[in-house]
Each structure stands twice: as C-alpha cells, then as structure tokens.
C-alpha cells in the first residue's frame, strides 16, 4: 500500500508546482532542494514528504500533458 498524504501537503505541492513548474524535475533530490529553497518547513519528515509527493505529482502531470496528444495520433492512424 502507498502513502496517503494530508490535504496540507497536497495543497503546498500544488502551489509549488504552479509557481515553479519550470524548475521541477522527476528527480527527488532536485525537488528536495526546491522545497528547501522555497518552503519554510522545520520538520525534516514533512519536507521529505513534500519533496516526494512533488516528484510524484510532477510525473502525473507530465503524463496528463502527453496523453491527449498520443490519443489524437492513434485516432488519426486508424482512419
């Protein structure tokens, strides 16, 4: 079973993603440095959870961006 993140962590990740979309990568360590730079979190555990969910959220959003384009290509190939 996977981790379940609180609403606060999800909200913070969405705000970070919206503001700094160009800096975020699919690498956990890079995202951890972004969290350290832009979010004032004193707890190491919470900071790591934010960085981990940010990495996962980035991958999900990246898939959503590429999915509609792939579907259009498949439809045009079938016709």
Swiss-Prot record:
BP terms from Gene Ontology: translation
Alphabetical list of InterPro entries matching this protein: Ribosomal_eS17, Ribosomal_eS17_CS, Ribosomal_eS17_sf
Pfam families hit by this protein: Ribosomal_S17e
A GO cellular component entry from the record: ribonucleoprotein complex
Alphabetical UniProt keywords: Ribonucleoprotein, Ribosomal protein
Any one Gene Ontology molecular-function term assigned to this protein's record: structural constituent of ribosome
Family: Belongs to the eukaryotic ribosomal protein eS17 family.
HAMAP family (alphabetical): Ribosomal_eS17
Protein's recorded name: Small ribosomal subunit protein eS17
Organism for this UniProt entry: Saccharolobus solfataricus (strain ATCC 35092 / DSM 1617 / JCM 11322 / P2)
Taxon lineage: Archaea, Thermoproteota, Thermoprotei, Sulfolobales, Sulfolobaceae
The gene coding this protein: rps17e
């Amino acid at each position: 079973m996977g981790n379940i993140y609180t609403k606060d962590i999800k909200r913070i990740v969405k705000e970070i993603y919206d503001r700094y979309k160009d800096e975020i990568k699919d690498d956990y360590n890079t995202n951890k440095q972004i969290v350290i730079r832009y979010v004032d979190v004193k707890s190491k555990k919470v900071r790591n959870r934010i960085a981990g969910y940010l990495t996962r959220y980035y991958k999900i959003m990246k898939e959503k961006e590429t999915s509609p384009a792939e579907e259009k290509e498949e439809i045009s190939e079938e016709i």
